[in-house]
Amino acid sequence: MVTMLMFLATLAGLFTTAKGQNFHLGKCPSPPVQENFDVKKYLGRWYEIEKIPASFEKGNCIQANYSLMENGNIEVLNKELSPDGTMNQVKGEAKQSNVSEPAKLEVQFFPLMPPAPYWILATDYENYALVYSCTTFFWLFHVDFVWILGRNPYLPPETITYLKDILTSNGIDIEKMTTTDQANCPDFL
């Protein structure tokens, strides 16, 4: 009984200390991904338009650049302008985890960390992309992340509404989504 109470207290602590993270009871949902996904069309620069806040992203002017590697995987280079004015960047590698579902990628930024899901739920390749990531912990709860990306620093409101409708129709909570400030950003990619 004491062990269970300690576990529940630890779990409650996780929920309260992970400011901005989107924790939910139960396993991750499994929304449909972009049909006939073409990774080559997806390559290039994307600007972060909106997101569910993530502890590993604290800045503004967030951009990602995807390029094809010699081994067939995708190099991921994320950059942001931190609150103190310095530019932070992290480089990772993404790969398609299942050939029959090419829009389901896995991305890894650090060798000792397990890869994280990176699912492209929707994209037209030229204007917008909707990315979803979710990890289940202990079969009891999950944490998810959402990114709305654009080829330009801003997307029309109707496009953002369309993408958010995809999320809500698949049971993904958008309440905590925030807009990423892309104003007065340096061109650092």
UniProtKB/Swiss-Prot annotation:
GO terms for biological process: brain development; glucose metabolic process; lipid metabolic process; lipid transport; negative regulation of cytokine production involved in inflammatory response; negative regulation of focal adhesion assembly; negative regulation of lipoprotein lipid oxidation; negative regulation of monocyte chemotactic protein-1 production. One of its GO terms (molecular function) is cholesterol binding. It holds the Pfam family Lipocalin_2. InterPro entries: ApoD_vertbrte, ApolipopD, Calycin, Lipocalin_ApoD, Lipocalin_CS, Lipocln_cytosolic_FA-bd_dom. Disulfide bonds join 28-134, 61-185. Keywords: Disulfide bond, Glycoprotein, Lipid-binding, Pyrrolidone carboxylic acid, Secreted, Signal, Transport. The modification Pyrrolidone carboxylic acid is found at residue 21. Gene3D superfamilies: 2.40.128.20. Glycans are attached at residues 65, 98. GO terms for cellular component: cytosolic ribosome; dendrite; extracellular space; neuronal cell body; perinuclear region of cytoplasm. Highest levels of expression in brain, testis, virgin mammary gland and salivary gland. Moderate levels in skeletal muscle, lactating mammary gland and thymus. Low levels in lung and lymph node. No expression in kidney, pancreas, liver or spleen. It is found in: Secreted. Residues 1-20 form the signal peptide. It comes from the Eukaryota. APOD occurs in the macromolecular complex with lecithin-transport and binding of bilin. Appears to be able to transport a variety of ligands in a number of different contexts. Homodimer. Belongs to the calycin superfamily. Lipocalin family. This is Apolipoprotein D. It comes from Mus musculus (Mouse).
